[in-house]
Amino acid sequence: MPLRKPAPALVTCLALLAGHPTIASASHAEDVFFEAPSQLLSPVTRPSTISTLRKLGVSALRIELSWHTVAPSANSMRRPAFNAKDPADYSWGQYDPLIEEAHRLGWRVLLTVSAPVPLWATANPRLRSLVTRPNAREFEEFMTAVGRRYAGEVSLYGIWNEPNHHEFLEPQFNADGTPASPRIYRGLYQAAYAGLRAAGIAHPATLIGETAPEGETYVRGPIRPGSAHNVAPLAFLRGVLCLDSSYRRAGGCSMLSPSGWAIHPYPNQAGPLYVPRNPESITIGALRRITGALDRAGYAHALPGSLQVYITEFGIMSKPNRYQGVPVAQQAEYDAIAERIAYSNPRVASFAQYLLKDDPMPPRGSRRVAFQTGLEYASGSPKPLLAGFPVPLTVTRLGRAYALWGYVRPARGATTVTLEGERRGSHNFSVLSLVTTDRRGYWTLRDPTTEASWRVRWVSPGGTVYVGPAIRAY
């Protein structure tokens, strides 16, 4: 599948950054939060996984902490007798050693505290739903325990995973078809913030949102419990902030003061330049929508002005996913383009990679969701993205020349990379240029040569050789 033509705004941005100087000139640095739950939460695979992530240049983790997993008597309809604010009354399991190891390595940790929840902490335990109307007061006390347990080791607290998605919070819509989850979530966010304050954290660094990329604004017809409807992220934002469709205050809600608004802007098979038709959806190619919405919310005094955007979960689905997967070579290209888009936006504070290893594919006919966004297949064999992730590269056609952007993720300071090109029909790469990065490892270059593909080679100070995959122009 050929790469699609880039959006005009992106071409303009790349054109401004392209030129003879080889050092990147972006105005901000980004965290890249890596998430590999199956491997990192297992004591068997954690050491080798940490070793792999260090080689890849990872220095920040996103960890999802399930309230249900650590709570006492989580499947009981009756709340047990315990001190919900005391960390000693919970079973933290493998979260403790993982967070301790990340702290020892000096890695930033985003801890997203989320569903499923204890059955006794729902509004109606008889429903046997672990995501329906969680009790905000109970959540506040739990967050006090979380804050006391991990203060000093966690850099950011994410409040709920994808609260606009029916698998993580119910109900999403009221019986009349209007969104229900935004107001439920607002209560949970405020409870979490108060709980962290009660833990002795004077100014908790929290992320609000963590929204799934697409959904609906209104649902027609009767809404049944458990129906698979999700609230569109911008409609969700307005509901959380008590704003009407024109971003005017629609109630007596006070301003919220999070550290940033978090999104999960997954694209579809069309790739990272895809812009959804629904103007309420947010993919990586539509970041302008979220920054515009945050500006309007700031103008309405529902949020602080110029709030930063955090991409906290992201990946490009590859084959063998039957529905959304792209070829694995294209996965590496698309992932680099997505990171380039995020890097180019000064309001974006972080990027993310969801999964080191693919989920196993479910059998045909199964309704189970599986992600093939990893750097490796489920078997552990590498995809091109395993080589591309530490040294992402994008190549954009600009008239008769090409604008190149790259990043040496494992570098700790300015370094030199070797740019190689492959002419059409040659099947061999030759050296085109030696490029100096900035102190964070980023670089740009204008290349007048006509190549079929490009790649980056870098040798670390310790002698490890990194060779990225072949990348085509787009």
Give the ranges of each region predicted by the language model.
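Boundary/entry segment of secreted carbohydrate-active catalytic domains
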Residues: 26-60, 64-66
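Substrate-binding cleft and catalytic face of glycoside hydrolase catalytic domains
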Residues: 56-227, 268
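Conserved, mostly hydrophobic/aromatic
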Residues: 34, 61, 102, 146, ...
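Short strand-edge motifs at loop-to-beta-strand transitions and within beta-strands
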Residues: 441-445
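C-terminal segment of classical bacterial N-terminal signal peptides
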Residues: 17-24
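Aromatic-rich peripheral "rim/lid" segments of glycoside hydrolase catalytic domains that contact
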Residues: 77-78, 149, 163, 168, ...
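Noncatalytic carbohydrate-binding groove/subsite architecture in carbohydrate-active enzymes
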Residues: 43-47, 136, 140, 180-329
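Bacterial N-terminal signal peptides that target proteins for export
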Residues: 1-10
